[in-house]
A protein has these predicted regions:
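Phosphate-ester processing/binding pockets and catalytic centers
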Residues: 1-212
Length: 212
């Protein structure tokens, strides 16, 4: 079984006058044939935080963690059998009509990323594929739209069965590791800070712009 885990960093806002509006939006996919070693990274990091800071179990969220926690988790991820593929979007160059259809834009970007994963044949799909995306919308209709759109695109073009799930990082621990990877890559583009990115760059097999 091949697993693809998907998360994003940045936002899809286009009012650049607002302070918190990001310049870039990225979608990160991590794929592996065995998710268990990555789950163990999360478990080990939680255990260390409990011992040192008496912190209760919860969710690791990279933006909220201390630098040492980020570094350790990313270094551990770099040692595992997994690969990362990224599409980054310079939002200033997004077509006007797509700016007004954010869900369509999100689906579009995700589909292009999945197409590249399949075309590069980085993962074996003969035993099936599970795509697990981090829950982005609480709206059930939008979640179903996302799942049906991607399933239709992949199955029609590649004749491959793909099972798509939308879960929280609490439900699917590996998504917490993808959050760290996505945050590290986002820092490189948004803030020209590649210090965290360099910890996992050996795992990144492709990193492409959309609307360059």
């Amino acid at each position: 079984m091949a697993y693809i885990f998907l998360d994003e960093s940045g936002d899809l806002g286009f009012n650049f006058q607002k302070k918190k509006t990001s310049k870039f939006f990225i979608i990160t996919c991590l794929f592996t044939a065995n998710k268990r070693p990555i789950e163990k990274i999360i478990k080990k990091t939680h255990s260390e935080l409990r011992k040192k800071y008496k912190r209760k179990s919860g969710i690791l969220h990279c933006v909220k963690e201390k630098p040492i926690t980020r570094q350790r988790l990313l270094q551990r991820l770099n040692e595992k059998d997994c690969f990362i593929m990224v599409i980054y979007v310079n939002k200033a160059r997004v077509y006007t009509k797509l700016r007004d259809a954010k869900q369509a834009l999100y689906n579009f970007v995700t589909n292009i990323l999945l197409e590249r994963i399949y075309n590069k044949k980085i993962i074996s799909v003969k035993d099936g594929v599970k795509l697990i995306a981090s829950r982005r919308e609480t709206n059930k209709f939008l979640n179903e739209n996302f799942k049906s759109y991607l399933s239709r695109q992949i199955e029609n073009r590649h004749k491959i069965k793909i099972d798509i799930f939308i879960k929280t990082p609490f439900e699917e621990k590996t998504l917490q590791a993808v959050d760290f990877a996505s945050w590290a890559i986002f820092r490189k583009y948004e803030y020209s800070d590649d210090s965290y990115y360099n910890l996992i760059k050996n795992k990144i097999v492709e990193e492409n712009p959309l609307f360059p």
